């Protein structure tokens, strides 16, 4: 499940804000009528709001994707980070829903869905395709994601430390660096057109 923790009240007044590291392995949030009635949507929105407020208040946030990062669970735990780093491994994926669910929703077989994903990167499940959207700051190639070697741990620690260093050196607390991926050009164009029309 998704867990969040409150930062110390004294930290809100501090000039140097506490760093937040999110380790992300969330297969998805719970689905169902009971969960909706009990307010899972409010819990997820509350988590998103907490992370966004922390980031905007100056807390550097780095997410390390070590497993599945699916649906609302990922949106509420990890997606609001200044930097998202992922392990380059077949077990690490980001998507709105699992393949079987996506196949049902799109009225396709899993095989047809995979064939479609091969030509449309945002539909794909592999982390390399997700990286083309410009949302990841780094892909880490490790020897053994399940049982990391000392070199794997060192690589991850160095990447995380570098990400925090870069965030602290920046003036912006936004997420605009995510708009420059090779497969985000149409999204960027839509934003430009909207900006022109609304100016």
Predicted regions and their residues:
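Glycine/serine-rich loop-strand microenvironments at binding/catalytic pocket rims
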Residues: 1, 15, 22-24, 124-133, ...
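Short N-terminal helix-initiation segments at or just after the protein's N-terminus
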Residues: 8-12, 26
């Amino acid at each position: 499940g998704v867990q969040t923790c409150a930062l110390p009240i004294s930290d809100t007044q501090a000039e140097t804000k506490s760093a937040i590291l999110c380790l992300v392995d969330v297969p998805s949030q719970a689905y169902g009528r009971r969960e909706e009635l009990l307010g899972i949507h409010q819990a997820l929105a509350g988590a998103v709001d907490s992370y966004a407020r922390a980031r905007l208040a100056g807390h550097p946030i780095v997410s390390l994707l070590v497993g599945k990062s699916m649906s609302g669970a990922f949106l509420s735990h990890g997606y609001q980070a200044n930097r998202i780093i992922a392990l380059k491994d077949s077990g690490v994926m980001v998507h709105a829903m699992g393949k079987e669910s996506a196949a049902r929703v799109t009225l396709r077989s899993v095989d047809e869905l995979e064939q479609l994903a091969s030509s449309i990167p945002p539909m794909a499940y592999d982390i390399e395709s997700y990286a083309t959207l410009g949302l990841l700051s780094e892909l880490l190639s490790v020897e053994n994601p399940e049982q990391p070697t000392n070199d794997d741990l060192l690589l991850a620690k160095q990447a995380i430390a570098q990400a925090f260093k870069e965030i602290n050196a920046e003036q912006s607390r936004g997420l605009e660096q995510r708009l420059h991926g090779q497969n985000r050009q149409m999204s960027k164009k839509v934003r430009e057109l909207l900006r022109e029309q609304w100016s």
